[in-house]
Amino acid sequence: MVREEITGSTQKLEWKCVESRVDSKRLYYGRFILSPLRKGQADTVGIALRRALLGEIEGTCITRAKFGNVPHEYSTIVGIEESIQEILLNLKEIVLRSNLYGVRDASICVKGPRYITAQDIILPPSVEIVDTAQPIANLREPIDFCIELQIKRDRGYHTELRKNSQDGSYPIDAVFMPVRNVNYSIFSCGNGNEKHEILFLEIWTNGSLTPKEALYEASRNLIDLFLPFIHTEEEGTSFEESKNRLTPPLLTFQKRFTNLKKNKKGIPLNCIFIDQLELPSRTYNCLKRANIHTLLDLLSKTEEDLMRINSFRMEDGKLIWDTLEKHLPIDLPKNKFSL
C-alpha cells in the first residue's frame, strides 16, 4: 500500500479497498481505508460502521426443521449416524444467499445409504447455497429420509425456546448476521494544525455477500437513519413544525380507488403486483419487507402506515404517488407526499 502525505484539510474524503481475498467459500475478507479525516472523526465513523455492519445487515437462515415421527430433539433415527440435535446444528451452519422476504419452504428428501450435504436441499428459486459441501447427516442404511424446512430473511440473532414437539417440528437458533467480524484502527499523520487521521476498516463475511457489499449496505442504512434530520434542516422547519408534519391527515386510499376497481376491466387489484409499477429497487424492497406485494396491499395502507416501514422515506412515498398518478386511469389528489 502506498501512503500519501496529507497536506490540506479541504481534500475530498475517499474510500479505497486496499486488500480483498477469499479464504474459503464461507470466509471473505476485505480491508478498506477512509481519508483524510479530522481528529476524532475516524473514531466516530469506525464505531458507527462497526455497529451497522454487525447488527443491521440482513441475512438468510434455516429457522425450522420438521422430521416425521420424532418425539424429541435428542432422538435418533435407525440408519442415521447423527442424532436429531446434531442434524439441527448442521442445518444451523448452512449459509444461504437470497433477496427474499418473509418465510419460504424448502425440503430434503433422499434415500440411503449416502451422505447428505447442503446440495441436497430443494430450495425456492430466490435462494442459493454458498457452500454445497456443508454436511448435514450420514445415512448408513437404505432408508428414505425427508425433512421439511423453513427459510427466513432477517437481521440479528434469534433464539426460540425448544419444547418437545408433537409433530416433529423444531426451531433452529438463527444467526442472521452475514458479517462475522469487523475491526477498525486509526492512523494519525501530519503535524500541528495539519494533523489528520486515516481510518482502516477490516471486514470478514460468511460468503453470502462480499465485504464491499456489506460496507455499502451498512453505509446506506446509516444514511437512511440520518435523512429525517437533513430534510428538516433543508426545509427550515422548527421542531414543533416538524412534529406536526409527522402526523399528517390519514390518506384513505380505499375511497379514492373505488373507481379504479371498476375501470380496470374486471382485473382485481390483488392480481396487480408492485413489480409492475417499475419502482426503484430500494423502494420496492421497502414495500416487500412490509409484506406489500400487490396493488391492493399498497392501496389499503395510509400514509402513516407507509412512513412506519423501516427505511421508508418521504421521497419513496412521493415516488409511489407519482407513479400511481402517471399510470392509473383516475384523478388523484395532488402533493400528498410533499417534500
Swiss-Prot record:
Gene3D superfamilies: 5' to 3' exonuclease, C-terminal subdomain, DNA-directed RNA polymerase, insert domain, RNA polymerase, RBP11-like subunit. Disulfide bonds: none annotated. Keywords: Chloroplast, DNA-directed RNA polymerase, Nucleotidyltransferase, Plastid, Transcription, Transferase. GO terms for cellular component: chloroplast; DNA-directed RNA polymerase complex; mitochondrion. It catalyses: RNA(n) + a ribonucleoside 5'-triphosphate = RNA(n+1) + diphosphate. InterPro entries: DNA-dir_RNA_pol_insert, DNA-dir_RNA_pol_RpoA/D/Rpb3, DNA-dir_RpoA, RBP11-like, RNAP_asu_C, RNApol_insert_sf. Its main location: plastid. CDD domains: RNAP_alpha_NTD. SMART domains: RPOLD. GO terms for molecular function: DNA binding; DNA-directed RNA polymerase activity; protein dimerization activity. Residues 266-339 are annotated as: Alpha C-terminal domain (alpha-CTD). It comes from the Eukaryota. It is an enzyme of class 2 (transferase). The keyword GTP-binding does not apply. GO terms for biological process: DNA-templated transcription. Its EC number is 2.7.7.6. The keyword NADP does not apply. It holds the Pfam family RNA_pol_L. It is found in: Plastid, Chloroplast. Residues 1-233 are annotated as: Alpha N-terminal domain (alpha-NTD). The N-terminal domain is essential for RNAP assembly and basal transcription, whereas the C-terminal domain is involved in interaction with transcriptional regulators and with upstream promoter elements. In plastids the minimal PEP RNA polymerase catalytic core is composed of four subunits: alpha, beta, beta', and beta''. When a (nuclear-encoded) sigma factor is associated with the core the holoenzyme is formed, which can initiate transcription. DNA-dependent RNA polymerase catalyzes the transcription of DNA into RNA using the four ribonucleoside triphosphates as substrates. Belongs to the RNA polymerase alpha chain family. This is DNA-directed RNA polymerase subunit alpha. It comes from Sorghum bicolor (Sorghum).
